[in-house]
Structure formats: structure tokens, C-alpha cells
């Protein structure tokens, strides 16, 4: 938090877990597909592999997780050194676009966890990158998506990316609009992506 009281963070720490970078150099034993000059992202999470969450196939919920930019110094620096196994290179994706993968993935994961199908009406509150990920993934699964935000430009993007309906919660009554859109049934799934 801005007050520095997040119990997960050990200060001081360099932030930065949404990583888009270009590989500067590689060490010995690094596979040939990881080459200097190649844009990449970094998997920012390091799981222990032995806690109950890891043993149950949920390394994202590892009790001893070490995330770049949270528990370990992150990418808001000129250079970072990372194990090659964390590097995801692709010469076709820019480092700027790579930085969007982590937050988009959070939205995609929320849709998977919500088991959203083409039978669902999904309300996504917040049209930042996590919300956009949820909107895109829900639309790809055939759900009817209702995007809610206070920013008309974000709502316009949400519409272009698959939202069937948009609601500006600053200028419209959300409850009334939901009732109109859903014939008084409301959404089947709500994803809060405001933070």
C-alpha cells in the first residue's frame, strides 16, 4: 500500500512484477531459444513446490511464494538477473506488449476459476488490464459481458473487445441498468477488477 504496511512486502524492495524486457545477456547452460536482443516477459512467481498449495497443483497460492517486485526486488530497474527457467521469449511480441501479459492473465484466470460458459451473463467491474483480460476471456467463452467503469474510453475499449453492454457507474444507475439488461435476473458471475 502507499503507507508501506502490506504484510507481504519486506521493505525496501524494488517494485515491478508486470515485466516486459529485452534479454541483454545470457549465462552458461542457457537453452539456445533464449538469445540476447529478444523481447521477453518473466514469470514473476517462485513457488516452493512442497507446501499444501503446491502439492495440490496450485503453485499460484504457494504459502512461501517469492514474487519479483513484492518479496524480491522487481523489474523497475535498468537490469535484473533471473533464472532462465523464468524467461518467456518471443521475437514477435514487443517488450511493451509483454508487460501486459501478467495482468491480462489474472483476468483470464478469474474467468477459468469462475467456470464461465456461454450460458452466463458476466459483470466485470473495472476495465483496467485485469478487467480487460476477464472481458476478453468471457467473450471468447461465449458469455454475455457487462462492463462497468467510470471512464468512457475504457468502456469503449471493453465494447470493442467483446463486452455486449457497458455501464458508466459515474453517470448511470448500475442497479437499474442491470435489471434492464438482464430482465431482472442480474448477472450469473461478477468479477471485481477495480483493486
Give names to the regions the model predicted:
Residues 3-52, 91-93:
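Glycine-rich beta-strand-centered segment in the early N-terminal region that forms part
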Residues 78-79, 144, 165, 189:
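Well-ordered beta-strand positions
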Residues 48-125:
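NAD(P)H dinucleotide-binding glycine-rich loop of Rossmann-like/cofactor-binding domains
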Residues 172-184:
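Short amphipathic alpha-helix with an adjacent loop that forms part of the alpha/beta core around
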Residues 93-172:
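Mid-domain Rossmann-like dinucleotide-binding core that forms the NAD(H)/NADP(H) cofactor-binding site
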Residues 44, 170, 194:
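Glycine-rich, N-terminal phosphate-binding loop of Rossmann-like dinucleotide-binding domains
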Residues 185-191:
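Short SAM/SAH-binding signature in class I
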Amino acid at each position: 500500500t502507499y503507507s508501506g504496511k502490506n504484510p507481504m512486502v519486506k521493505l525496501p524492495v524494488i517494485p515491478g512484477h508486470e515485466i516486459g524486457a529485452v534479454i541483454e545477456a545470457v549465462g552458461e547452460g542457457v537453452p539456445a531459444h533464449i538469445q540476447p536482443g529478444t523481447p521477453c516477459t518473466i514469470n514473476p512467481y517462485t513457488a516452493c513446490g512442497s507446501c499444501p498449495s503446491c502439492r495440490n497443483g496450485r503453485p499460484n497460492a504457494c504459502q512461501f511464494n517469492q514474487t519479483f517486485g513484492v518479496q524480491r526486488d522487481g523489474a523497475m530497474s535498468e537490469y535484473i538477473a533471473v533464472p532462465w527457467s523464468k524467461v518467456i521469449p518471443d521475437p514477435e511480441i514487443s517488450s511493451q506488449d509483454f508487460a501486459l501479459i501478467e495482468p491480462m492473465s489474472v483476468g483470464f484466470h478469474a474467468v477459468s476459476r469462475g467456470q464461465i460458459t456461454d450460458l452466463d451473463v458476466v459483470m466485470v467491474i473495472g476495465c483496467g488490464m485485469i478487467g480487460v483480460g476477464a472481458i476478453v476471456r468471457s467473450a471468447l467463452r461465449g458469455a454475455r459481458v457487462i462492463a462497468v467503469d467510470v471512464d468512457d474510453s475504457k468502456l469503449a475499449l471493453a465494447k470493442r473487445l467483446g463486452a455486449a453492454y457497458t455501464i458508466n457507474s459515474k453517470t448511470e444507475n448500475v442497479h437499474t441498468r442491470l435489471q434492464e439488461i438482464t430482465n431482472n435476473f442480474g448477472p450469473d458471475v461478477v468479477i471485481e477488477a477495480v483493486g
